[in-house]
Amino acid sequence: MEAIAYSLAFTFLKIVIVFSLALGIGAYLTWFERKLAGHIQNRLGPTVVGKFGILQPLADALKLATKEVIIPRGADKPVYYAAVVMALVPSILLLTIIPFGPGFRVGNTYIEPIIADVNIALLLAFAFGSLSVYGTIFSGWASNSKYAFIGSLRKAAVVIAYEVVLGFSVLGVILLAGTLSTVGIVEAQIQKGVWFIFYQPVAFILYLFCMLAESGRVPFDIQEAEAELVTGYNVEYGGMKFGAFPLAEWYVNVIALSAIAVVLFFGGWDGPHIFGPLSPYFWFVFKTFALVFFTLWLHWTLPRFQAKDITEIAWKILLPIAILNVIITAVVVYAF
């Protein structure tokens, strides 16, 4: 009984730590992205609040917290509020199946730096990723606004198309690793001595497309499309509720999907032991934020696709390539 209570308490502690870090890092990615955008556009970015504008996220949070919240006339209030939760929670839940490093011992206790080490981790990742679109759909429907509704429909169309491509892009990795466990996939790469990016470069490119589409990043941000829909599905939200949507979709989601990409294609925590026992955790964080940086950089360098082109690219180009990649991988795995 004591062992069960201890295990539950320790799991709860890991949940609090991971979720707090995700929200905190996600908030500070807003500052980093604005600095990056300023550098790309030959300006300084945030400079006023704190040295180098480092306290800008705190100022933004204070501003949003003190904003007046105006609910549109005719809005479905229960669904209106539930949409915020449905947008934020699935993005955070994605972090529960990510192994941040190898297990280690502290005294007689074996600690695994993952919240849910289950054999169907990737299946859960797909489930959590699919749930996030409901927050978008609920917000568009409940807001009683044509701009919000059109934005939510666009997001739903993108997710339906790219979830299929995402599933096929990951199938090749599953065939190579022989497991749906994220820990097992990392261990398979370490055992083979080769990261799956070298076996599955096409799958990684497909995954990158899907990651940008799922997180609503340029060139796939047609659900916001400021020139067409103001800010899209969350246009009728104010205060902290308004900030919760980009925090979930643009930042926490990008962190989670980048971390999953590291697990699938870049060997997870595998890397040279240059920092002693901390090396695995360093390499995992380094690889993850290298992908996050790449995603943010693309956002400020690429133009937006037209709405009609995005789903056509998925169904007519990416999906056939993904299916062909799975067939070739299956033949090679079966033959060798």
Swiss-Prot record:
Any Gene Ontology CC annotation: plasma membrane
GO terms under biological process: aerobic respiration
A molecular-function term among this protein's GO annotations: quinone binding
Enzyme Commission (EC) number: 7.1.1.-
Membrane topology reported for the UniProt record: Multi-pass membrane protein
Keywords attached to this entry: Cell inner membrane, Cell membrane, Membrane, NAD, Quinone, Translocase, Transmembrane, Transmembrane helix, Ubiquinone
InterPro entries, sorted: NADH_UbQ_OxRdtase_su1/FPO, NADH_UbQ_OxRdtase_su1_CS
Top enzyme category: translocase
Compartments it resides in: Cell inner membrane
Assembly mode: NDH-1 is composed of 14 different subunits. Subunits NuoA, H, J, K, L, M, N constitute the membrane sector of the complex.
Function: NDH-1 shuttles electrons from NADH, via FMN and iron-sulfur (Fe-S) centers, to quinones in the respiratory chain. The immediate electron acceptor for the enzyme in this species is believed to be ubiquinone. Couples the redox reaction to proton translocation (for every two electrons transferred, four hydrogen ions are translocated across the cytoplasmic membrane), and thus conserves the redox energy in a proton gradient. This subunit may bind ubiquinone.
PANTHER family: NADH DEHYDROGENASE SUBUNIT 1 (PTHR11432), NADH-UBIQUINONE OXIDOREDUCTASE CHAIN 1 (PTHR11432:SF3)
Protein name: NADH-quinone oxidoreductase subunit H
